[in-house]
Curated annotation (Swiss-Prot):
Gene3D superfamilies reported in the protein's UniProt record: Acetylglutamate kinase-like
Protein name (record): Uridylate kinase
Physiological role: Catalyzes the reversible phosphorylation of UMP to UDP.
Known pathway: Pyrimidine metabolism; CTP biosynthesis via de novo pathway; UDP from UMP (UMPK route): step 1/1
HAMAP family to which the protein is assigned, alphabetical: PyrH_B (MF_01220_B)
Residues passing through the membrane, by range: none
Record organism: Janthinobacterium sp. (strain Marseille) (Minibacterium massiliensis)
Length: 238
């Protein structure tokens, strides 16, 4: 068997990815398929941490939050990520994968608090760590949480799972001539105004020299191919 390209990775999942074809919430078939993909990577011996969004349940910047205090709306979004994290961990448990949910906000009866040395210990033991509640602060996205946690745990790369199979020169849904970049530098992405992550998350990854791989979570086997270092998605690097 070929050796994986990475030993420790941070996977960023959007909450919307859990919806499947449903208008909101968690689609069971979709989460089971995601867990199967994660299981394939875990079997390779790759240490895997996950940050998940909450947009399938609530978004602090969504129309439903209009008129609401932004900080309050963001806290509600953090709670949504805890719900998603619990669902993901439970789906993993049912197929024999040991996962630990660690929250940036204290909900100790439900999940344990995020403590960096403990998270590192879990990863070294071969457990999957799911980081919930974003950064624990309002006004920061879960993309920023992914960049932050990835930096903290010494991940070699942030894997940003999306609905498109990489970064394109233009919106592929609108422009038939849009081309996918196999690799692109952080500075090139900025100069071309390409939306990879929000500005705070992107700047943190660039400053920490933490590469980002953008790939499609809906494409079968894509996660494993990314971890094996194959030509899948777009690599954003220094």
């Amino acid at each position: 068997m070929t050796t994986p390209a990475y030993k420790r990775v941070l996977l960023k999942l959007s909450g919307e990815a859990l919806m499947g074809d449903d208008p909101y919430g968690i689609n069971r078939a979709t989460i089971e398929r995601m867990v199967a993909d994660v299981s394939e990577v875990a079997k390779l011996g790759v240490e895997l941490a996950i940050v998940i969004g909450g947009g399938n349940i609530f978004r602090g910047v969504a129309p439903g939050a209009q008129g609401m205090d932004r900080a309050t709306a963001d806290y509600m979004g953090m709670l949504a990520t805890v719900m998603n994290s619990l669902a993901l961990a439970d789906a993993m448990r049912q197929v024999g994968i040991t996962a630990r949910v660690m929250s940036a906000i204290a909900i100790e009866q439900v999940v344990e608090p995020y403590v960096r040395p403990k998270a590192l210990q879990y990863l070294e033991e071969g457990k999957i760590v799911i980081f919930a509640a974003g950064t624990g602060n309002p006004f920061f996205t879960t993309d920023t949480a992914a960049a932050l946690r990835g930096s903290e745990i010494g991940a070699e790369i942030v894997l940003k799972a999306t609905k498109v199979d990489g970064v394109y020169s233009a919106d592929p849904n609108k422009d038939p001539d849009a081309t996918r970049y196999a690799t692109i530098t952080f500075d090139e992405a900025i100069s071309k105004h390409l939306q990879v992550m929000d500005a705070t998350a992107f700047a943190l990854c660039r400053d920490q020299k933490l590469p980002i791989k953008v790939f499609s979570i809906v494409k079968p086997g894509a996660l494993k191919r990314v971890v094996m270092g194959e030509d899948e998605g777009t690599l954003v690097h220094v």
